[in-house]
């Protein structure tokens, strides 16, 4: 969902950051190839541009969660100066905040969080606070165990 001037760039940077983490090469991404599909095999990257805080949430739109069920969701926060930022400055940090499973998303509470442009987004999102996500130091092991078992 595009709700601000920087949403597309935020998503792209999130995918680049994850590719660097996962494959030690930011170029091993699927940007431009994955429209309407998960970002990486069995992994959906959820990137947001906000000042980093552990009270932020991994958000998955209810309608998206019904359409596709990647086994893993990873939250990345592009740490901008303001929640109303309309550009991403050079040397801005990306925090790979944590991960959740599709099952955890499906059992999470739902809420309309609005958008950067208005108080109502017109849709509900499943949400899990960043501080409640699995830590990234467990991700690769769980991911590769899941791949082997499928």
Model-assigned labels for residue ranges:
Residues 1-39, 46-150:
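Nucleic-acid endonuclease domains
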């Amino acid at each position: 969902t595009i709700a601000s001037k920087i949403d597309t760039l935020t998503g792209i940077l999130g995918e680049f950051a994850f590719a660097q983490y996962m494959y030690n090469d930011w170029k091993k991404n699927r940007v431009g190839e994955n429209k309407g599909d998960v970002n990486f095999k069995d992994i959906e990257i959820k990137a947001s541009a906000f000042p980093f805080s552990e009270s932020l949430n991994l958000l998955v739109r209810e309608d998206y969660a019904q359409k596709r069920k990647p086994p893993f969701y990873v939250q990345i926060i592009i740490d901008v100066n303001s929640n109303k930022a309309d550009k991403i400055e050079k040397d801005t940090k990306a925090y790979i905040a944590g991960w959740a499973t599709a099952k955890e998303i499906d059992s999470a509470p739902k809420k309309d969080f609005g958008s950067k442009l208005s108080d109502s987004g017109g849709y509900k999102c499943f949400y899990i606070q960043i501080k409640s996500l699995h830590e990234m130091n467990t991700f690769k092991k769980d991911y590769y165990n899941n791949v082997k078992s499928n």
